[in-house]
A protein has these predicted regions:
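Short active-site-proximal "capping" loops at secondary-structure junctions
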Residues: 36-37, 51-53
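FMN-binding flavodoxin-like domain, especially the glycine-rich phosphate-binding loop
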Residues: 24-28, 44, 53-169
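Generic beta-sheet signal
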Residues: 3, 44-45
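N-terminal beta1-alpha1 ligand-phosphate binding loop
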Residues: 2-26
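Short acidic low-complexity segments
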Residues: 30-41
Length: 169
């Protein structure tokens, strides 16, 4: 199985998740930022984005839009990374990503992220300080990454791709 994991990231967590996912899907796997994808000649294309200010990165939605016709001919899965505080919104984010994706997405992975306000740029830091203040919560480093969840998703993708291949025979 030849897999491409295309993603964008602001501070590196989505790249970490992409690497873990590449290990989990096994077979030949390439990882690329959406801006650097040169080909979609893969059995499976997995597209990932962090969620910032209640939306996936525009670079990822633009990638889905720009490559929509080619992706309609591919097995596609999606994943996104978000702060655990936003759990109740996860289905909303999944649906938003699906709006840009082919209609027959194999699966959508939802993964907790890592958040450390000290590494943010000034604009993002102020945005997050305001966010925590509105929630009435005190800022702390949050690490909700879980490699086991990512590995399970990778195995699920392998299974779904095998099923998809069997149904076309």
């Amino acid at each position: 199985m030849k897999t491409l994991i295309a993603y964008d990231t602001r501070y590196g967590t989505t790249a970490t998740i992409a690497r873990w996912l590449c290990e989990a899907v096994a077979g030949e796997c390439d990882i690329a930022n959406v801006a650097d994808v040169a080909s979609l000649d893969y059995d499976l294309v997995v597209i990932g984005s962090p969620i910032y200010t209640d939306a996936p990165l525009s670079s990822v939605t633009q990638f889905l839009h720009d490559h929509g016709e080619a992706l309609n001919q591919k097995n596609v899965a999606l994943f996104f990374v978000y702060d655990e505080l936003l759990t109740e919104k996860s289905e909303t984010y999944a649906e938003e990503l699906r709006e840009y994706a082919p209609p027959d997405v194999l699966a959508v992975g939802i993964f907790g992220g890592y958040f450390d306000i000290s590494v943010l740029n000034e604009h993002d830091r102020h945005t997050m300080e305001d966010f925590f203040e509105r929630l009435g919560k005190r800022y702390e480093v949050l690490d909700h990454r879980n490699k086991d969840d990512v590995v399970r998703f990778g195995k699920l993708l392998r299974e779904k791709l095998s099923e998809a291949r069997r149904s076309t025979i």
